[in-house]
Amino acid sequence: MYERGAFVADHVEPVADDQIQPNGVDLTVDAVLEQTEPGRIDTDGKTIGDRSPVTPTADEDSTDTTVTIQPGTYILQYAETITIPENHVGFVYPRSSLMRNSCMLHSAVWDAGYTGRGEGLFEVHHEITIARGARVAQLVLATGDHENTYDGSYQHERTDTRPGE
């Protein structure tokens, strides 16, 4: 069963009232990256390929900082820090505005115990301009029955509280 948006909002930081939806919380764009070097996934580990940010531009019609993205595959980083509570699992879905503009956002399962500022795989099929801070995805939380919580290499990603540092 999915939790209500107000419950999800308690596990997202920062969050504005207009991000809270009936069944989840909208996530916003922090950065868009392009992978520039190959990665590798082995049986005993992984290497994430080098990435570089898509260069933002100042929008002459507003105070927003925007990026114009050409067709291709990118990494979209979210601005919010997410904490998935025990006995829950997180799912991130694209907002319909992305799909209506020939774009798609993919995400892996967000395990209980994960804390961090995550990212998604962003497919662009037609040029689009996106403002930093634009709402592009929705996080929902479902109840889950599991024995352990997340303790992997992405714990506390892109936050100031990485263990052991």
From Swiss-Prot:
InterPro entries, per database record: dCTP_deaminase (IPR011962), dUTPase-like_sf (IPR036157), dUTPase_archaeal (IPR023537), dUTPase_trimeric (IPR033704)
GO biological process, one term: dUTP biosynthetic process
UniProt KW keywords: Hydrolase, Nucleotide metabolism
EC main group: hydrolase
Coiled coil: none
Gene3D superfamilies in the cross-refs: 2.70.40.10
Biased composition (Basic and acidic residues): 39-49
EC number: 3.6.1.23
Pathway assigned in UniProt: Pyrimidine metabolism; dUMP biosynthesis; dUMP from dCTP (dUTP route): step 2/2
Molecular-function GO terms, alphabetical: dCTP deaminase activity; dUTP diphosphatase activity
Residues covered by region (Disordered): 39-64
Signal peptide: none
Family annotation (HAMAP family): dUTPase_arch (MF_00635)
Family of this protein: Belongs to the dCTP deaminase family. Archaeal dUTPase subfamily.
Protein name: Probable deoxyuridine 5'-triphosphate nucleotidohydrolase
